Amino acid sequence: MSEHKWWKEAVVYQIWPASYKDSNGDGVGDIPGIISTLDYIASLGVTTVWLSPMYDSPQDDMGYDVSDYENVYSKYGTLQDMDRLIAGCHDRGLKLILDLVINHTSVEHKWFKESRSSKDNPKRDWYIWKPPRIDSNGNKHPPNNWGSYFSGSAWKYDELTGEYYLHLFAESQPDLNWENKECREAIYNSAIKFWLDKGVDGFRIDTAGMYSKYQHFKDAPVAFPDTEFQPCEIYHKNGPRIHEFHKEMAKVMEPYDTMTVGEVGHSTREQALKYVSAAEKEMNMMFLFDVVELGSDPRDRFRYNGFDLVDLKKAIKSQGEFAEGTDAWSTVFIENHDQARAISRFGNDSPEFRVLSGKAIAMLQCCLTGTLFIYQGQEIGMTNVPRSWPIEEYKDINTINYYRAFKEKYGKDADYKQKEEKLVDVINRLARDNARTPVQWSHQQYAGFSEVEPWMRVNDNYKEINVEDQDGDDHSLLNFYRKLLKLRGEYKDLFVYGEMKFLDFDDKKLFTFAKEAPGSPVAYIVINFSGEDVKFEPLIKGNYKLVLTNVDKDSKDALSPYEARMYVVD
């Protein structure tokens, strides 16, 4: 069995500050709002809070465009508020980790302002600048065909010095040049040591596989012939110096007992293990996207093909097994700030099955091996935004840019309206904004998130789905999560560290698996992921004792729609 560590046993609750809780009536969530709910967070059974970017920022990409690592976005609060949050978490036995956004900064960061000021500036080489390509007519073009994750070219021309800078994300997010040692040292001091010295317990490391770019900056292979700019992951992910950089960064954190989890994304098992093998001393663990990107093209989230339950099992198997038999560690998550809501994506958000399928997903997730991550609102079953919302309600730069590019490309086609409807269907299913609507605290106006109209529209179903109503209801999804997290905490060897065995893998309606650990009874979990009754046939021998289920009636012979059962078998 894997060596026990606090960060392996952590249950992490992710907070997206803008949409969590507004304390001062400006319509935007803030740090004092978070502090006011720490008792609620502790009551869930979580052990760690992950706070998404709260640094000073122009907010072009919701704080992933940092203008000052050593300060706080004014609408969220102050450095003093952060000190209070750190102390408030620690007083309740909670750890606090921050988002570490160091692949890029904002164009408003003082480093970039200096870098762009002249070709001779000492910080010029802290970012990635290249001269234009000039065609036979003397026209300027980007240095290569690399595409941005947020549509269009990954290069932006800067008139002042006549060169392009690289931005793998938005134009306002220039990539830092990790090849420059002075730049790296500044990152470590400003973004890492500053916060660890304040008492923060670690980091979720954003875009952790992107720091080392191949220095030839060649054109990327053409993956989408209908698009001028191409996905360029092969030249900026898992690059030649990436592990050198991570080892160097880990040395900076070594004096502190930190938890680090990397967002690396699409990697082979061999590539992934290099980041999180204990022997390599880089990161504790990483997020793999097998589950949350099911049915989508990882290079283009809105090219969607759908999936079935067997596909989901394959993704969970792949994600769970990658660390088995190694000294690495895995993570378990099904929602975050970049993904759609799990009930809408993997369950059934109709009024009839919403709560049942939410409990089914909860049981599945809370029984998986690895460090468990839960996203704000997931514990009450918040859903995707209604399909009836117009595109104007979406705030995310990723969606806005994609929709704009789509309209420019197809807007004059005779069948544009049909194409647009199909795109909006997919946007509604997968857009990041689904996770970014305000947390639904009560059935009061604005869902108890704020006393004024929030920065983003509250989901229309807040009167049916909210913390206040579920808190005192023993049969609610919220209290089902509490029961599951209590079980997970009491039986760590089984649920956190145990071995998962899939049973009847090809069944397209039932998800059945066992969890085993030395010295523990076998846990047998069976979940009906369909909207119809399915016959129940025990797949392992022994005496079955029902521990937890999401339905009131006791039917041993069949599972009703979205019924989930946990047995102990001896």
Curated annotation (Swiss-Prot):
Induction per the UniProt record: By maltose and sucrose. Repressed by glucose.
Source organism, top-level taxon: Eukaryota
Molecular functions per Gene Ontology: alpha-1,4-glucosidase activity; alpha-amylase activity; glucan 1,4-alpha-maltotriohydrolase activity; oligo-1,6-glucosidase activity; sucrose alpha-glucosidase activity
Site positions (Transition state stabilizer): D338
Active site: D206 (nucleophile), E263 (proton donor)
Cited InterPro entries: Glyco_hydro_13_cat_dom, Glyco_hydro_b, Glycoside_hydrolase_SF, O16G_dom_2
Catalytic activity: Hydrolysis of terminal, non-reducing (1->4)-linked alpha-D-glucose residues with release of alpha-D-glucose
GO biological process, one term: maltose catabolic process
EC number: 3.2.1.20
Keyword Hydrolase belongs to the record: yes
Keywords, comma-separated and alphabetical: Glycosidase, Hydrolase, Maltose metabolism
PANTHER family assigned: ALPHA-AMYLASE FAMILY MEMBER, NEUTRAL AND BASIC AMINO ACID TRANSPORT PROTEIN RBAT
Family stated for the protein in its record: Belongs to the glycosyl hydrolase 13 family.
Protein name as catalogued: Alpha-glucosidase
